[in-house]
Amino acid sequence: MRPPISKSWPAPAKLNLFLHVTGQRDDGYHELQTLFQFIDHCDYLDFQVNLCGEIKLHSELSKVVADKDNLILQAAKSLQKHAGVTQGADIWLEKLLPMGGGLGGGSSDAATTLVALNALWNINYHVDILAEIGLKLGADVPVFIHGLASFAEGVGEQLKPVLPAEKWYLVLVPNVHVSTQAIFQSPELTRNTPKLSLSNLMSQHWSNDCEKLVIAHYPQVANALSWLVEYAPSRMTGTGACVFGEFEQEQQALAVLAELPPNMTGFVAKGMNRSPLLERLANA
């Protein structure tokens, strides 16, 4: 008899509250300084362990299941191989986060897969080992594994937990996909922002070095940002396309959401310095 399905493992979105590109390494990767904070909008994953060793992904989104490079499958297979386990898993994905919007949904799904199967397969790796496995899948997978709002340096893998204000955000989702690779390969990208200490960064005006380039080439992002900035301090997350405005109160964000033009989509979310994944793990 198979084990029961372990349900509702959250994979939260993240915002880059600031993002500075401070250099480029010889291997082509970029040096960053950024601040990650989670928001309370999540994908959800269910897991059922099997004894045959097969890893299978189920989703209502056929293109997710058909993608053999899907990060969920990569994460599960990487952990299975690293730990030498013979068990497999059926994985069900409820995809609620926009894809390719700079909210980290794919990386978060991978992180939740590693954290959940580490528990369900009784591997019990330390979180740092999971983060090492996750880093090979993507630079921002480790922050989702650790589950704490963090200041990040290097390519984004050197993490220091911080406690920024947990504000309310109105997140707009422009109907366009921005290629992260294209942005970081562009000769127009600012790559020489001076490195600053964490204390200086936390006290200054926050910005995103990728924003100027993206809004120059993607009018949908430019239009969303120019509309939102009329109501609140606003900027882009990651390499876009999503942009966010920050508010002190939920009601303020909801009031602006109600004014949203019919050609734009968005949602209101709460900033979280502790990922809901940690609470789910505690109840595994």
Curated annotation (Swiss-Prot):
ATP binds at residues 98-108. Pathway: Isoprenoid biosynthesis; isopentenyl diphosphate biosynthesis via DXP pathway; isopentenyl diphosphate from 1-deoxy-D-xylulose 5-phosphate: step 3/6. The active site is at 14, 140. Its EC number is 2.7.1.148. It catalyses: 4-CDP-2-C-methyl-D-erythritol + ATP = 4-CDP-2-C-methyl-D-erythritol 2-phosphate + ADP + H(+). One of its GO terms (biological process) is terpenoid biosynthetic process. Catalyzes the phosphorylation of the position 2 hydroxy group of 4-diphosphocytidyl-2C-methyl-D-erythritol. Belongs to the GHMP kinase family. IspE subfamily. This is 4-diphosphocytidyl-2-C-methyl-D-erythritol kinase. The lineage of its organism: Bacteria, Pseudomonadati, Pseudomonadota, Gammaproteobacteria, Alteromonadales.
